[in-house]
């Protein structure tokens, strides 16, 4: 008989020990030390959950008034919004990254984000369930409910800690991919600028024949002007009018070429203007000599 009683006591003690889960300290995550908005929002949720887990008189009162679940709803929405915004910000910098890599990183980060959101929702739902259970007891002892809630919250905090660690890792990988994409974008810009500079150099080389044609045209015009200056004196007035028209055209065309060729054509234009002035002077001297000769005859 004593043996049976001893066996019964041992069985009961073993069952009690199996029901009581050993207290495991939850390591406080430090992922929000970098100060990103999504990490700060997550830290507010974590601190509030740690306060709820104390199940103090104030916590009990706010749980029964639905204030805790409402506050958790706001904290969850704020956290998920900040995570989404930060992810979108990193996606903008993933442009130059290969599409398959971008899709893989996005899928992994989305999965970590979904797990965290689901576990946060489960915490809120469990607290709402506790509120309903306490109200249904109608003044009876709720110690067993509080014990179960404490155990469940402890487990959920451990799961949330793993979710946070995983999300932190995925965010770090995503950020590294964004930085790599930004560096590739800068390299592409540098290559593009180098190509444009090379194109400009080639265009400068190909524009040299145009300068040579303009110079030949100027030489041709000077030859024509010299030929006009040697014509007969009775056509002097006509020659002057033609020379004036030619001068106007030459100046207009010279200005057009000067705008297109800029510094290349300016030295040649200055030379043309100088030779033109010398030619006019020669013509005027010749004309003056021809008009003074008859007046000196007896």
From Swiss-Prot:
Heparin binds at residues 155-158, 217-224. It is found in: Secreted; Secreted, Extracellular space; Secreted, Extracellular space, Extracellular matrix; Extracellular vesicle. Residues 259-271 are annotated as: Specificity for association with VLDL. Residues 203-271 are annotated as: Lipid-binding and lipoprotein association. Pfam families: Apolipoprotein. The modification Methionine sulfoxide is found at residue 137. Sequence repeats lie at residues 74-94, 95-116, 117-138, 139-160, 161-182, 183-203, 204-221, 222-243. One of its GO terms (cellular component) is chylomicron. Its main location: secreted. Keywords: Chylomicron, Endosome, Extracellular matrix, Glycoprotein, HDL, Heparin-binding, Lipid transport, Lipid-binding, Oxidation, Phosphoprotein, Repeat, Secreted, Signal, Transport, VLDL. The modification Phosphoserine is found at residue 141. One of its GO terms (biological process) is lipoprotein metabolic process. APOE exists as multiple glycosylated and sialylated glycoforms within cells and in plasma. The extent of glycosylation and sialylation are tissue and context specific. Glycated in plasma VLDL. One of its GO terms (molecular function) is cholesterol transfer activity. InterPro entries: ApoA_E, Apolipoprotein_A1/A4/E. The keyword Transport applies. Residues 1-18 form the signal peptide. Residues 95-243 are annotated as: 8 X 22 AA approximate tandem repeats. Residues 151-161 are annotated as: LDL and other lipoprotein receptors binding. The keyword Repeat applies. Homotetramer. May interact with ABCA1; functionally associated with ABCA1 in the biogenesis of HDLs. May interact with APP/A4 amyloid-beta peptide; the interaction is extremely stable in vitro but its physiological significance is unclear. May interact with MAPT. May interact with MAP2. In the cerebrospinal fluid, interacts with secreted SORL1. Interacts with PMEL; this allows the loading of PMEL luminal fragment on ILVs to induce fibril nucleation. Belongs to the apolipoprotein A1/A4/E family. APOE is an apolipoprotein, a protein associating with lipid particles, that mainly functions in lipoprotein-mediated lipid transport between organs via the plasma and interstitial fluids. APOE is a core component of plasma lipoproteins and is involved in their production, conversion and clearance. Apolipoproteins are amphipathic molecules that interact both with lipids of the lipoprotein particle core and the aqueous environment of the plasma. This is Apolipoprotein E. It comes from Cavia tschudii.
